[in-house]
Amino acid sequence: MTNPFELTATDAIKLIGNNKLSRYEWVQSCFERIREKEDLVKAWVYLDEDRALEKAKQLDNKGDKSQLGIPFGIKDIIDASNTPTGFGTNFYQNNVPMRDAASVAVAKQSGCIFIGKT
């Protein structure tokens, strides 16, 4: 099988639906790839690996195929609850919103898994 991080969301969801891939494996593969390339790319300002993997595990244990489990990241100008939002400046370095932006809330309600900020 292809490395899970290389799969399209459509292909990964099909494999999850056929019990050939877990959400945990998919998210874990994404983090492995990020760790492998981040020194070169320098794209991520915040990663939430522990919470993301825990969420993936919860979705896998539920067995609910309607919860997609798609890993997603957002720009550091968009709020995600209990996650630093720095707007790319030191002035806001201690800004930790308590609520998700509407787009993040909708993604999470659909079972998508927040992995971090770029």
What residues fall within each predicted segment?
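Amphipathic alpha-helical segments that form the core helices of the histone-fold
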Residues: 34-35, 53-57
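An N-terminal boundary/leader segment
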Residues: 1-46
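Glycine-rich loop at the start of a catalytic domain that most often binds anionic cofactors/ligands
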Residues: 56-61, 85
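Long amphipathic alpha-helix in the N-terminal Rossmann-like dinucleotide-binding domain
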Residues: 50-54, 108-112
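Enzymes and membrane/adaptor proteins characterized by extended Gly/Ser/Thr/Asp/Glu-rich
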Residues: 66-106, 110
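Flexible N-terminal pre-Rossmann segment of NAD(P)-dependent oxidoreductases
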Residues: 3-7, 62-70
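General beta-strand structural signal in soluble alpha/beta enzymes
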Residues: 74, 114-117
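Short secondary-structure junction/hinge motifs that connect adjacent elements
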Residues: 26-29, 44-53, 67-74
